[in-house]
Amino acid sequence: MHEIKNQYTEKQGYHDVTHTHHQGHESVSHASCITVVPIFNHLEGEQMEEIMKVTKSTSFKKGEVIYREGDISDCLYIVSKGKIRIYRLSESGKEQLVRILNPGDFTGELALFRESIQEAYAEAMSDTDVCMISRNDLQEFLLKYPTISLKILSEFSNRLETSEKQTTRFATEKVDTRLALFLAECMESGDGPMEIELPMSKKDLASYLGTTPETISRKLADLENEGYIKQKSGRMIEILDLDGLLLV
């Protein structure tokens, strides 16, 4: 991944990506993209079929870059299968994880409103299937089916809230608190077992929380020693004292 830093000159556009990965097209179902993504799954069957006709699909191997900072941004990318990490690189080469996309999530939404270039990197975290809809096609659908616009605005609102929360924590909270709040937010509501699975590696979690993997490991051990959590196999963590965790 470090070799990415010096590859700013390659400007991949909508058509470049689809041609580069042409061999993977046949294995990706357009229907699986359209029906799984929240901004489309409320549409009627005929409306979905209309969108599928202009959707292009491709596959990416683990570690492969979908787009780079500086690339032309001219389409919406929808994750059909797998995971994508969106991150930025500082001038010194330090990585900052922005978000992780799961099936049904999308990126490239700014291209819907204006011509622009990518401001971050998108990399496949596992073998990943992606569907793409060009800006021109999607703008037509936004006019034709206004409910899509409302769904996109809702997602914008969620991302803005998350971004503001993350920025505030970076400025005001110590690493212990950032980590504790992250673990608490991973909890699903309900009365079931208080167990979570970390949605990313410790390296990515460190990047997301603005620290180092070593610090994450040390802070998790501290939280365990203090009786707030119990680390299990893999990425599983049991929350033993949620109220106490929220006060860290």
What are these regions (language model features)?
Residues 99-157, 161:
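Cyclic-nucleotide recognition modules
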